[in-house]
Every structure is written in structure tokens, then in C-alpha cells.
């Protein structure tokens, strides 16, 4: 399907706007993937706040010009799906987890803070907990001493009340 020049310009602007605020851009090759699998991948990406798009590589190369992802342009060959996210690990995590389930998706490369990553580095990035997970762990660690102190006071008060009643 051939796109006219105006449609291509609009697509490049839309993609540029979507990746302008992204910290991470990950590209994965797909060959022979079923429609249901692609729909599931899109749903997972949407749930995690990841911009996921299949598009022509020439349009993707134009969209990354002037961004921190310009170094990734060399990797844009073949049938690719592009995932971008403001969360540093979300795009890598979505594609990596889906690639584990479906061998027709193969993570090729990624870029984080202007650094190009190979598939192994993207897998490492995907293994890092998300910001929300890290914040919840930090909150739990900070809350544990306080809740322990509160339980200790409650037990002491209960013990005193039991002694006074006897």
C-alpha cells in the first residue's frame, strides 16, 4: 500500500511527537505473527503505557532524526514493531516478555538515553523493576519499622490492660 506524501508527513509528525518524551525506544522483528498475537501485544503495550506501532522503516528513520534515538536508525531493517515509553523499562519489558511467549517476535535492539543497546542489553533493562515497583518496595521498607513499633506499643498496652484487669 502506497502512502501519499501528506499522509507520510502526518505519520512522521505523529511518531515524532510520541517519541519526543520517550526515554526508551525498542525495536523487535516480527515474522509470521498471527493477528491475535499482535492484538494481544498491542493490548499489553496499551496497558503499560507503551506506544507501539508497526510502520515503514523509512518513516521511522525520519521520525527519529533530531532525537536521542537517531543512532538506532542503522538497526531499522526488516519487518519491525517499534515500542517507545516514558518509563525507562516499560517498552523493553513489554516486548521482552511477549518475545518469551511468542518466538515470532525477536527483540533486535533498543536505545536508552542515547545509547544503542543490543538484544541482551534490552533483556537486562527489561529485568529491572518498574518505577512503581521500586517505589512500593521503598515504601514497604520505610513503613516496616514504624508498623513494628506500633504493634509493639499495642502489645504493651494490651499487656498492661490484662495486668490491671487481673
Swiss-Prot record:
GO terms, molecular function: large ribosomal subunit rRNA binding; structural constituent of ribosome
Domain of life according to the entry: Bacteria
GO cellular component, one term: large ribosomal subunit
InterPro entries, sorted: Ribosomal_uL10, Ribosomal_uL10-like_sf, Ribosomal_uL10_bac, Ribosomal_uL10_bac_type, Ribosomal_uL10_CS_bac
Cleavable signal peptide: none
Family annotation (Pfam families): Ribosomal_L10
Keyword terms of this UniProt record: Ribonucleoprotein, Ribosomal protein, RNA-binding, rRNA-binding
Biological function: Forms part of the ribosomal stalk, playing a central role in the interaction of the ribosome with GTP-bound translation factors.
Protein's name in the database: Large ribosomal subunit protein uL10
Amino acid at each position: 500500500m502506497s502512502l501519499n506524501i501528506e499522509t507520510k508527513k502526518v505519520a512522521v509528525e505523529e511518531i515524532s511527537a510520541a517519541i519526543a518524551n520517550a526515554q526508551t525506544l525498542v525495536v523487535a522483528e516480527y515474522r509470521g505473527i498471527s493477528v491475535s498475537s499482535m492484538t494481544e501485544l498491542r493490548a499489553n503495550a496499551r496497558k503499560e503505557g507503551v506506544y507501539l506501532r508497526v510502520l515503514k522503516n523509512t518513516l521511522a528513520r525520519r521520525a527519529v532524526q533530531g532525537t536521542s534515538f537517531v543512532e538506532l536508525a542503522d538497526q531499522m531493517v526488516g519487518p519491525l514493531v517499534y515500542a517507545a515509553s516514558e518509563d525507562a523499562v516499560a517498552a523493553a519489558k513489554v516486548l521482552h516478555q511477549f518475545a518469551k511467549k511468542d518466538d515470532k517476535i525477536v527483540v533486535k535492539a533498543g536505545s536508552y538515553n542515547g545509547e544503542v543497546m543490543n538484544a541482551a542489553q534490552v533483556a537486562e533493562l527489561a529485568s529491572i523493576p518498574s518505577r512503581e515497583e521500586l517505589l512500593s518496595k521503598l515504601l514497604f521498607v520505610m513503613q516496616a519499622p514504624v508498623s513494628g513499633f506500633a504493634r509493639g506499643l499495642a502489645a504493651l498496652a494490651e499487656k498492661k490492660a490484662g495486668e490491671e484487669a487481673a
